[in-house]
């Protein structure tokens, strides 16, 4: 499920897209693929995109892959900034959750992205209403790019994350920074 896309041979920004998924009153939503606010496979930024996933205390949302606010894919180049992911209620994300991911080439950024995950509080402290099957990142740079992952934020309550949590995660080569992340 995708809010906006710039294809591989195009140039331009993917911005201001919103994906909203809501399960009401004993309902269940199952999505067999990924959910993203905006994906840029060309030349340009992915910014100000949002994903909102919510459910009531008697319903759930299950995503079989990952959830992210904005992405510059490996075939693209540009910055990923100010994307938001909000997940509340109950359900399971089988893979990772990220506010912004930059896999593009050249010098880039993945900054000021926000992830909020808030599950229902259970009487049993070992039971979580939201399960994340992998990790949670505010913003990340992956692959061979250099750049900044700055001022990203992650907030998680009443939820279980299987792997790790990071505000900013920078795997770029060359001159990189990761600062002021929460």
What are these regions (language model features)?
Residues 1-34, 39-66, 71-96, 101-164, ...:
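Surface-exposed loop/turn motifs in large extracellular/passenger domains
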